[in-house]
């Protein structure tokens, strides 16, 4: 190969590298020119009284969580800061068309914008990435950060609540006479008055839904244009979020409603079953466990009571009353004529009147089936007819052994003894017959007393059943109305359609 051809080959191989080498050298020369005598601690103001305008924006990548217990909101964001540093401007034509540079954040002046309402004392960003400097002197810095900001939680309508959490940014080192803050610009470079959602990396929260995300510039008192020394401007970003209540509906409210139904059906359980008290106390203990579980979720505040706690307390009061009223029902059920005498008003109200309204009907006792006496058409001897009438014809029991009147027990009717010891004593029975009739009369009285005792005891049991049914319908009405009143109130608690009406 001739020397000329070798030179041509080397020139062809080195030609693609020449622009890159020249570009690196041009960028290096530009850096040396820009930072020759540059002091990153000096504010980029042409005059002493000039204010540096800093645009503050926020790009939301993820709403990590909202800790109601600690009143803390965790977010993953990109802080979008933009300002103009006249010392970092150049003519692209003089530097091989270089239009922008990426420079480490430590090398340039920074407006020192930090989160004021942080909850962990960390004011810095997570990573000091490089700033992008354009040829006209504009500087843009988008450092990522995980912020834990304080958020005042309103627990009145928990878990059907919405919260208004704020992130307050301000310059920590400069007041409003040195640095002028303004709301950030959108991706298109136009005015942007809300938090920008990073479409590519945004992760939706499973518990909270973002409703509004506006921002607002808070001017210090006085002239908002000129600024005042010692006072700082603030840019506040609002996150108005609404809770997704499905988790609490399935895991808390639905079990509470089922437990309330158990407490209601305690009054449908017969007192003889022996489980009325056990079922009531079981429901009461279950609600107590739910209250203990919710205590770790709700902030410890005395300003208001959450709506779910109101519902649990309402249910607990109902279940407590069900325990007390079950005791009353059992007390009525086990009463007897030997221990309690039924008042007339109790009999009138709970036996004769209330059952009609409660759709209760007391079964009627079956009548004694007695054969009809045979009709003797042919005349017979006097002894035979008397014998037939003695053994076949049965006098009414109320006539021989009258039942005492339950309403007026003092009224009594004559009994069988009037046939034994009449007032005129005209008819005298043989001593053997008198002893037989006296024994029969004693046995009949004992049977009658036992029958009356059982009847009065059944009356008390029927009163207990009527009271049980009355409590059942009362609890159904109170539970339905109370549940609707408590939860319908939450349906009117909605986020405002306009965050700044």
From Swiss-Prot:
The chain crosses the membrane at residues 245-269, 277-295, 311-332, 470-488. Disulfide bonds join 151-165. It comes from the Eukaryota. It catalyses: K(+)(in) = K(+)(out); Na(+)(in) = Na(+)(out). It is a multi-pass membrane protein. Pentamer of two alpha chains, and one each of the beta, delta, and gamma (in immature muscle) or epsilon (in mature muscle) chains. The muscle heteropentamer composed of alpha-1, beta-1, delta, epsilon subunits interacts with the alpha-conotoxin ImII. This is Acetylcholine receptor subunit beta.
